[in-house]
Amino acid sequence: HIQAQKNEFFRPKEVWNDTEGNPINAHGGGILYHKGTYYWYGEYKVGKTVLPSDATWERYRTDVTGVSCYSSKDLLNWKFEGVALKAITDDPNSDIHPTQVLERPKVVYNKKTKKFVMWMHIDSPDYSKAEAGVAIADSPTGPFKYLDGFRPNGTMSRDQTVFVDDDGTAYQFSSSEENQTMHINRLTEDYTKPDGKYVRRFVGMAREAPAVFKHGNKYYMLSSGCTGWDPNSAELAVADSIMGEWTVLGDPCTGPDAEKTFYGQSTFVIPVQGKKNAFIACFDMWKKKDLQDSRYIWLPMMIDKQTNKITIPWHAEWNLDVFKKK
């Protein structure tokens, strides 16, 4: 067994191998930093991509196999930790049966319960179910136990993310109302359910693929438009409080193909530990006809010292030296 070549640079759109030399398979993913280690969770897409014969739009799919987990100290070299949440193959009625849809898994750590809580978009093959699913584990690498799927506060939930604020309160952001409006759902103290308080934001603006982060005293949401697997313009929005009013700032991407988000779609924003004002914007470059070979586009966010304006410039190759040390 030969140790694979170490990754020295981020190379967006290129095949990105794990420490064993296999392509990283963690799509629509999210990153958790816990006790000195980053954990990357994503859709584990294995096997042939098919277009169902009854499809009325390009809903290319692979069977659900589960949610993969990778670990890293440096964000560049990732060790495959296995499938942290496995599809339930012996119960055809399960939300996470191979015939169903499981997308955009995000894991947060609950300091009170000491549990790792995974939220995900679960759906029927025709995307009519529009629910959120929740699973929990005692360890970051799993195994995660699937708890339940539901419509948060009785409303549709498709593309989604979870954000934990500095005070320990968690929120689920989800594309609701036929993907036309973003719902921000506050969660219970154990992070496993909505607590009943929610707001409707970006009404009628059809934003998907939310990624939320905090910089200074402000909250930011990066999102995409709503064009299926095909790329569109990214958009950044800002708020003084999560449940407050959000202001659209426009497209932060710059460089070639910026108006198409470099052919990517947002999935997460990583705060880089030990660096000042350092965030990585993570995008998926979907290959709709071969979803397993969808690539990743990770790019550094640039924050202007004077104006606090955030841009995401294209880099074909970069490393963490672009950020200043704390």
Whereabouts are the PLM-identified features?
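Carbohydrate-active catalytic/glycan-binding domains of CAZyme proteins
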Residues: I2-K326
